[in-house]
């Protein structure tokens, strides 16, 4: 069911993960155990329960500037050319394909703003998508506990965050100047993608690892179709591009790839 809905492959080795993420949820529903829960999500009236199940199973650990080498590479080797294009009237698009609670796309936006504070005046957009509508609501709100900002520099925190109170709790709110660069949309990576144009950069980190090998290969190939020559793909630390997509992605750094049609003639 999870596989057909979202491409997530859960074999016997993932049993402890499933138990840890669902057991409390099942108790909160007042159900007797996993058998009754499975009957619920498999029933014709179980669509909402299946969405809840996906939410619990796909919520991943995230933090600002996680795997910071990606943001350093973006800042030093990718953005200078893209920002020059934007200044010249060109279009720039970045996709955070599994954005979770927003810390990844906000990290991208903060990296961009560190180089070009007035980037919102140009045609420079970041799309952030996730399968979970609840986690997207958190992302859009952009209010985080102080502990989440441990990897944000003091200068960046001072410039782009403000202290607020949310339901009696102390939070740090992302500045609207950061938010306006990002559009959040719900998207299942296994479904049809509604995009008309290409992306200059795609971040898809620590998600494809949950797919089986055939599904992973399809996802890499679909990403390839959305990148222009020289476009960049950043993936998770345990992930590797596989299948036919290996012929069009050059590994240029730690889990960092550049799309190039020059590799089309290479043998596997």
UniProtKB/Swiss-Prot annotation:
Q: Which UniProt keywords apply?
A: Methyltransferase, S-adenosyl-L-methionine, Transferase
Q: What is its EC number?
A: 2.1.1.80
Q: Which SUPFAM superfamilies match?
A: Chemotaxis receptor methyltransferase CheR, N-terminal domain, S-adenosyl-L-methionine-dependent methyltransferases
Entry binding sites for S-adenosyl-L-methionine: 60, 62, 66, 104, 130, 188-189, 205-206
Keyword Repeat attached: no
Q: Which residues form the CheR-type methyltransferase domain?
A: 1-262
Give the reactions, separated by semicolons, that this protein catalyses.
Answer: L-glutamyl-[protein] + S-adenosyl-L-methionine = [protein]-L-glutamate 5-O-methyl ester + S-adenosyl-L-homocysteine
Q: Which Pfam families match?
A: CheR, CheR_N
Query: Record keywords: Mitochondrion included?
Result: no
An example of a GO molecular function for this protein is: protein-glutamate O-methyltransferase activity
Q: Name one GO biological process term.
A: methylation
Top-rank taxon, per record? Bacteria
Q: What cystine pairs are annotated?
A: none
| Gene3D superfamilies per UniProt | Chemotaxis receptor methyltransferase CheR, N-terminal domain, Vaccinia Virus protein VP39
PANTHER family per the UniProt record, alphabetical: CHEMOTAXIS PROTEIN METHYLTRANSFERASE
Q: What does this protein do?
A: Methylation of the membrane-bound methyl-accepting chemotaxis proteins (MCP) to form gamma-glutamyl methyl ester residues in MCP.
Q: What is this protein's record name?
A: Probable chemotaxis protein methyltransferase
Source organism lineage? Bacteria, Pseudomonadati, Pseudomonadota, Alphaproteobacteria, Hyphomicrobiales
């Amino acid at each position: 069911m999870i596989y057909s809905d979202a491409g997530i492959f859960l074999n016997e080795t993932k049993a402890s993960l499933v138990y840890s993420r669902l057991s409390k949820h099942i108790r909160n529903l007042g159900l007797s155990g996993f058998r009754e829960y499975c009957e619920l999500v498999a029933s014709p009236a179980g669509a909402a329960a299946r969405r809840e199940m996906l939410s619990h199973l796909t919520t991943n650990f995230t933090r600002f500037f996680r795997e910071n080498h990606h943001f350093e590479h973006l800042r030093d080797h990718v953005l200078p050319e893209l920002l020059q294009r934007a200044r010249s009237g060109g279009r720039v698009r970045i996709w955070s394909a599994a954005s979770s609670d927003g810390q990844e796309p906000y990290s991208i936006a903060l990296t961009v703003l560190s180089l070009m504070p007035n980037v919102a005046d140009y045609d420079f957009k970041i799309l952030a998508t996730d399968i979970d509508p609840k986690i997207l609501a958190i992302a859009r709100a952009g209010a985080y506990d102080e502990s989440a900002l441990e990897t944000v520099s003091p200068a960046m925190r001072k410039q782009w965050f403000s202290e607020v109170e949310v339901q009696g709790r102390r939070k740090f709110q992302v500045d609207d100047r950061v938010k306006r660069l990002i559009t959040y949309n719900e998207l299942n990576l296994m479904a049809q993608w509604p995009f008309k144009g290409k992306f200059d950069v795609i971040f898809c980190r620590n998600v494809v690892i949950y797919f089986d090998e055939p599904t992973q290969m399809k996802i890499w190939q679909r990403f390839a179709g959305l990148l222009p020559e020289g476009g960049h793909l950043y993936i998770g630390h345990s992930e590797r591009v596989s299948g036919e997509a290996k012929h069009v992605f050059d590994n240029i750094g730690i889990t960092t790839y550049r799309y190039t049609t020059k590799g089309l003639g290479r043998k596997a």
